[in-house]
Amino acid sequence: MKTTAKLSFMMFVEWFIWGAWFVPLWLWLSKSGFSAGEIGWSYACTAIAAILSPILVGSITDRFFSAQKVLAVLMFAGALLMYFAAQQTTFAGFFPLLLAYSLTYMPTIALTNSIAFANVPDVERDFPRIRVMGTIGWIASGLACGFLPQILGYADISPTNIPLLITAGSSALLGVFAFFLPDTPPKSTGKMDIKVMLGLDALILLRDKNFLVFFFCSFLFAMPLAFYYIFANGYLTEVGMKNATGWMTLGQFSEIFFMLALPFFTKRFGIKKVLLLGLVTAAIRYGFFIYGSADEYFTYALLFLGILLHGVSYDFYYVTAYIYVDKKAPVHMRTAAQGLITLCCQGFGSLLGYRLGGVMMEKMFAYQEPVNGLTFNWSGMWTFGAVMIAIIAVLFMIFFRESDNEITAIKVDDRDIALTQGEVK
């Protein structure tokens, strides 16, 4: 099997795994009697794990272990943990196992990116073509857990633990396949200490003003973006969309198209404009949700347009962000830098977004009694998210001033490395 095919299959299974359990989880936990707060904390597991993931995939992988071997170990461990999590019926039993599972999975996002980056000749041209298979994997998981069982005459498996068991099996599969991936050895031999272990050596990249603005805006954007992941399925179901789990894969279908078109957009418009367009389309998506419902054809169409824009927004911001980080980070810090963005976005940003969204829904947007069949003021919630993103877009447009021909790796000399490792005071 050619290297590109191996990397593409890796991405397919990597994102199939996450999509299989993450989208339908709300339905299963709700049916199992978990409270809204417990469900919120369950979703926050991935964010908590992302905060710690640089320990596993940042500086350790950069210095000591081949990336594909680390991937195999994490996937095998995750398969066992998810299998046992699927057997639980109480929050006390489920939450620790899901958190432990998330600690094995979240590091692999940056890890698979790094494996792909290290084994393609032209990152800006080739990475989107490989990463698009991850989107197809997410779609496949939605179809497998949404439409497919019903098409075959079986009951809907979304509100059951079967998606979690599918996740466990898929994790074991990728664990085996990881041994057939191209060898991606460590690229640095620097001294190892606690600062390096935590990935803090990559923080030196924040001295670059444009990278700092990018990092800060990515952190802020992750908060309102989290509202979509935790609330969209419940919202779409409550306003009348049948089989929302399956229909939400439309966002990934649009992601495929724009992923393949991404090299054209980045070359034609530049990285800054593409990142900005990702923010703008995210705000518009929430705008469509404000007015969407299943009552009329027009308002029903707004729901589907909102779902489709999710793929556009994700591609234009986050996939472009991975490319930008790879361009800015020195070669020996690239895995740590990808882990730093994971820490920023899927970690602290998402965690705060899940908690902020939960508090806002409970304190400000929950109806005492159902209003027109709705238990929450969804329009108010989506308005709040849209305004947040609009403000972030304005900040990014004003303060990020780096043009494409100015994007080069941040220079890190021996003294900088010594400072990050505590050798110079």
Swiss-Prot record:
Main location: membrane
SUPFAM superfamilies: MFS general substrate transporter (SSF103473)
Membrane-spanning ranges: 9-29, 39-59, 64-84, 91-111, 132-152, 162-182, 211-231, 245-265, 288-308, 340-360, 380-400
Signal peptide limits: none
GO molecular function: cytidine transmembrane transporter activity; uridine transmembrane transporter activity
GO CC terms of this entry: plasma membrane
Residue numbers on the Periplasmic membrane side: 1-8, 60-63, 112-131, 183-210, 266-287, 361-379
Pfam families cross-referenced by the UniProt entry: Nuc_H_symport
Membrane topology: Multi-pass membrane protein
Entry's family note: Belongs to the major facilitator superfamily. Nucleoside:H(+) symporter (NHS) (TC 2.A.1.10) family.
Name of the protein: Putative nucleoside transporter YegT
Organism (species): Escherichia coli (strain K12)
